[in-house]
Regions:
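N-terminal glycine-/serine-/threonine-rich phosphate-binding loop
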Residues: 1-38
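General beta-strand structural signal in soluble alpha/beta enzymes
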Residues: 8, 38-42, 82-89
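Short, active-site-adjacent cap segments at secondary-structure transitions
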Residues: 14-16, 44-48
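Residue-level detector of alpha-helical secondary structure
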Residues: 25-29, 49, 75
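Ligand-binding beta-strand-loop-alpha-helix segment within the catalytic cores
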Residues: 51-89
Length: 89
């Protein structure tokens, strides 16, 4: 068992700027890291859609932003099927 856990965020800007190939490359780099690694997905284009809706109350926007992270996590799991998609660690 690893002595530590490394937490890495892969943000949605990577998808916007480099597409799926950039996400795959980032996942490859993360997979090469030593020890236990947890990837936290950003919201990506899904969070952008939440931001585009003007006037949402903060609690609603927050809930939607968390859902956006789940959706982007599903994209990461598609791009790198060797990653295990989990809801909690």
């Amino acid at each position: 068992m690893a002595k530590y856990t490394l937490v890495v965020k892969i943000g949605g800007g990577l998808l916007r700027e480099g597409g799926l190939a950039a996400l795959r490359a980032a996942c490859d780099e993360v997979a090469a890291l030593p020890g236990r690694v947890v990837v936290v997905p950003g919201g990506g284009p899904f969070a952008d859609a939440v931001r585009a809706v003007d006037g949402l109350p903060n609690p609603v926007a927050h809930r939607l932003a968390l859902a956006a992270m789940d959706q982007f996590g599903a994209v990461l799991a598609h791009v790198a099927p060797e990653l295990e998609l989990v809801g909690a660690v």
